[in-house]
A protein has these predicted regions:
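A contiguous, well-structured pocket-lining segment that forms one wall/lid of small-molecule binding clefts
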Residues: 188, 192-264, 270-287, 311-317
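Conserved phosphate-binding catalytic cores of ATP/NTP-utilizing and phosphoryl-transfer enzymes
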Residues: 1-2, 107-135, 308-310
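Short beta-strand-loop/turn "lid" adjacent to the catalytic site in phosphate-handling enzymes
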Residues: 60-98, 103
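Short glycine-rich, Thr/Ser-proximal phosphate-binding strand/loop in the N-terminal lobe
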Residues: 10-49, 155-160, 293
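Glycine-rich beta-strand-to-loop/alpha-helix junction loops that act as flexible
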Residues: 76-79, 140-142, 265-273
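Glycine-rich phosphate-binding loop plus the immediately following alpha-helix
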Residues: 113-116, 150-198, 220, 225-229
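Gly/Thr-rich phosphate-binding beta-strand-loop-beta motif of the actin/hexokinase/Hsp70
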Residues: 1-26, 133-150
Length: 319
């Protein structure tokens, strides 16, 4: 059986994924990087160190799924975004591993950005991207972007049309979570706490202008509430999630105002959040916009988009 390997070494997860000819996941191995308690992140050198340790172990785990099959192509993320000024050492870990494997196996190696990996993780479940331009919402620990995506023949053009001017939605949530004593990354813990809040909870308005939003002021406000100690953890978490939602909806309102897009794709680790996922879906339904989130479990960092890239490019090349 022909199989396709994807590799992604992002800021906080080492990921390998193996797909078959039908783009079904045969193996999905991930390891979240270890962040010391109370810390809000890692340095790039720490990320590289952990990726270098994780890659051989995850490769050994995935090897049993490769046995008896033929790896036809490998794809790897090599930078955060498909831009000349986009660079992050963490991705060199995966790139080095992918180059070595592709050379040893004598198979093609394809590169893509981490952002493209996220988008393809969503489209893998659908099968193919639309011919007309679509709108993408990328929400993760380091990114809050609204994108215009257009597939033109063999190339995909991604243009940022909006997003945050300061901290991302993921950073906002993580900073609040760590201040509350929750583990980092804090997204799933803040999500769980928010769902237990009693009574009606509203978020705070978010500054917005011409497709840009700012979360830093609201993060500072919520940090002051935490310091004051008069608001429960559950309420703080719910207020944070509702505030993030307010920002997301402002971005989407601006992007969709011209009625250019029929489809919105939502990707990134923050979109694993149950409240945000269902709320954005409901908002798009009211607008009669097709809403395509990455499959549950594949919004967070993973390598399924890279593996899907390997499969598609291999068939395009007619090898």
């Amino acid at each position: 059986m022909k199989v396709y390997l994807g590799i992604d070494t992002s800021c906080y997860t080492t990921s390998l994924c193996l797909l078959n000819e039908q783009a079904a996941v045969l193996a999905d191995e991930r390891r979240i990087l270890t962040v010391p308690e109370g810390k809000r992140g890692l340095s790039q050198s720490e990320m590289v160190y952990q990726h270098v340790r994780n890659l051989p172990e995850l490769t050994e785990k995935i090897a049993s799924y490769v046995a008896g099959n033929t790896v036809c192509a490998v794809a790897v993320t090599d930078k955060p975004r498909r831009r000349d000024d986009s660079y992050m050492p963490a991705f060199l870990s995966g790139l080095g591993c992918a180059r070595s494997l592709a050379a040893m196996l004598n198979v093609p190696l394809y590169r893509l950005s981490h952002q493209e990996n996220h988008l393809l993780a969503a489209w893998r479940a659908v099968g193919k991207e639309p011919k007309e331009p679509y709108c993408a919402l990328h929400l993760s620990g380091g990114t809050t972007d609204i994108l215009r995506v257009e597939t033109d023949g063999d190339s995909t053009v991604i243009t940022r049309i909006g997003g945050t001017t300061d901290i991302s939605a993921g950073q906002f949530i993580d900073r609040v979570g760590v201040a509350l004593g929750l583990p980092f990354p804090a997204g799933k813990y803040v999500d769980r706490q928010s769902l237990t809040a009693l009574g009606e909870v509203n978020g705070f308005p978010v500054w917005h202008r011409d497709g840009s939003i700012s979360f830093s002021g609201r993060e500072s406000h919520i940090q002051r509430l935490i310091t004051a100690g008069e608001t429960s953890c559950e309420i703080i978490c719910a207020q944070t999630m509702h505030t993030v939602l307010n920002g997301i909806l402002e971005l989407l309102d601006t992007a969709l105002a011209g009625n250019e897009y029929k489809t919105v794709v939502a990707v990134g680790g923050v979109m694993e959040n149950n409240f945000l996922r269902t709320s954005v879906e409901a908002a798009m339904r009211r607008r009669r916009i097709e809403f395509i989130p990455a499959p549950q479990g594949f919004s967070a960092d993973n390598a399924s988009g890279a593996a899907f890239k390997a499969l598609r490019e291999y068939h395009k090349a007619g090898i």
